[in-house]
Amino acid sequence: MGTPCHYALFDLQPAFRLDLDKLAVRYRELAREVHPDRFADASEREQRVALEKSAALNDAYQTLRSAPRRARYLLAIGGHEVPQEVTVHDPDFLLQQMQWREELEELQDEADLDGVGVFKKRLKVAQDTLNDDFADCWDDAAQRDKAERLMRRMQFLDKLAQEVRQLEERLDD
């Protein structure tokens, strides 16, 4: 049994831009259908299949709801498997990363919750810009390198956004 395309599980065509609210509604509908508890009285084989379907659905949903994971997945199904770990040759973005990290460290040292809020808004704008840029080029074979570079930038910003949320929680306590 092969793993079905994440998009096919949700009756979607591969695309970067998705309505995440509709995706969540469809996920809940499908999750109810394949939930292992519904198969408690079924045969062992049917229970195993239900568990596998539930796990595949959860993985597909987690992938599609995350912009960086969705970008990586789109590149992979397009035949451009992206290695997890590579040396990034993007000096401008590396410099930007260092500046963001320094700024976040200063906000933490100063316990500046308002400043963190402003930083978070700027980060969201940067993420939205990357998402738009990726959406415009991911399915163009001539722009695969650009799409991969944008996907890696998305991954960094996603990780930075998680760190910002954690800092917000610490400062808010």
UniProtKB/Swiss-Prot annotation:
Gene3D superfamilies: DnaJ domain (1.10.287.110), HscB, C-terminal domain (1.20.1280.20)
Designated name of the protein: Co-chaperone protein HscB homolog
Chain coiled-coil ranges: none
Record bears the keyword Plastid: no
One of the record's GO molecular function terms: ATPase activator activity
Sorted UniProt keywords: Chaperone
Primary role: Co-chaperone involved in the maturation of iron-sulfur cluster-containing proteins. Seems to help targeting proteins to be folded toward HscA.
Name of the gene encoding the protein in the UniProt record: hscB
InterPro entries xrefs: DnaJ_domain, HscB, HscB_C_sf, HscB_oligo_C, J_dom_sf
Intrachain S-S bonds: none
Subunit structure: Interacts with HscA and stimulates its ATPase activity.
Domain annotation J: ranges: 5-77
BP GO terms, sorted: [2Fe-2S] cluster assembly; protein complex oligomerization; protein folding
NCBIfam families per UniProt: hscB, PRK00294.1
PROSITE patterns (UniProt xref): DNAJ_2
GO CC term, one of those recorded: iron-sulfur cluster transfer complex
Family: Belongs to the HscB family.
Domain of life: Bacteria
